[in-house]
Structure formats: structure tokens, C-alpha cells
Design a protein with these regions (language model features):
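Nucleotidyltransferase catalytic core that binds NTPs
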Residues: 1-162
């Protein structure tokens, strides 16, 4: 079983691609949202759980959870032996390598597996999606269509603009 962690604020087509590919590689995949009280997410935890369940509803071996604290502790508690991470660029690799090595030091029995982002998704990040939509750009193809509608509604709620 594998664990795919992230903030997923919002979920992008890059995340969805990794979820689909991870679902095909592992008999069970937990998509785990990090609860971070220091950040002010665009979407609350329950909203992100709902969105992830919605986009993964056709993947019966995928479940959605959330955690606070150390990722490797949550992985161990969940019975996951693998942490799945996506790599978009060299800069991602440098950060992810440090995290993987620290996780290995803390819990040597849990492996980290890196998947390269699909070519169509290698430039997508939640941060960029939020920036593009706030500046009035088109995010079609960057996020699942159901998420695009939610993003536009949330932006309208926050700013009065869409």
C-alpha cells in the first residue's frame, strides 16, 4: 500500500494524473491531505477531502485521509510501506530527496517512490493555478472541470471578481 501526501489546494490535473498512475501501481493508495494550521488554504480541509473523493470516485482502491505531524508516522499508522511523490523538475527532486532521506532516517521500513510528472502536467502547481485564476487567466485543462467551477466560485466569494 502507498500513501500520496499533499496539500491539494486545489487539486490539479497533475495531482490527478499521479493518483491514477499510483492507483494502477499499488493495490491500495491513500491520498493524504496535510493539516497545516499555519497556512491559510483557499479550501478548508473538508472541502479538499470532498474534492479528492469526487475526482477519485472511479478508482476503487483509492481512499482519502488527512494527517498532522510527521508523514512517516501517519504512513506507519495507516499500514503504508511506500510514500509516493511526484517530480516535475530538478528543483522538486532536490527538495524531495532531502525529505525522502529524512523520512528514511525516521522510519527505514518506509520507502519513497518518485514518479515523473506526465509531460502535459510537468509545469502545473496549485500555487500557479491560483495565481493564474486570480489574474483572470484561463485554467481550463489545468484542473478537473468540477474543481475549476469551485475555484471560480471561491474567488468570487473572496474578491467579488471571477
Amino acid at each position: 500500500m502507498a500513501l500520496y501526501p499533499g496539500s491539494f489546494d486545489p487539486i490539479t490535473n497533475g495531482h490527478l494524473d499521479l493518483i491514477q498512475r499510483g492507483s494502477a501501481l499499488f493495490d491500495r493508495l491513500i491520498v493524504a491531505i496535510l493539516r497545516n494550521d499555519e497556512k491559510r488554504p483557499l479550501f478548508g480541509l473538508e472541502e479538499r477531502i470532498e474534492m479528492l473523493r469526487e475526482v477519485a470516485r472511479d478508482l476503487p482502491n483509492v481512499e482519502v485521509g488527512s494527517f498532522g505531524g510527521l508523514l512517516v508516522d501517519y504512513a506507519a499508522e495507516s499500514g503504508a510501506s511506500v510514500i509516493l511523490r511526484g517530480i516535475r523538475a530538478v528543483s522538486d527532486y532536490e527538495y524531495e530527496l532531502q525529505m525522502a532521506l529524512m523520512n528514511r532516517r525516521l522510519r527505514p521500513e518506509i520507502e519513497t517512490v518518485f514518479l515523473m510528472a506526465g509531460e502535459a502536467h510537468s509545469f502545473i502547481s496549485s500555487r500557479l493555478v491560483k495565481e493564474v485564476i486570480r489574474l483572470g487567466g484561463n485554467i481550463g485543462g489545468l484542473v478537473p472541470s468540477s474543481i475549476e467551477g469551485r475555484l471560480k466560485r471561491r474567488l468570487l466569494e473572496e474578491t467579488g471578481e471571477a
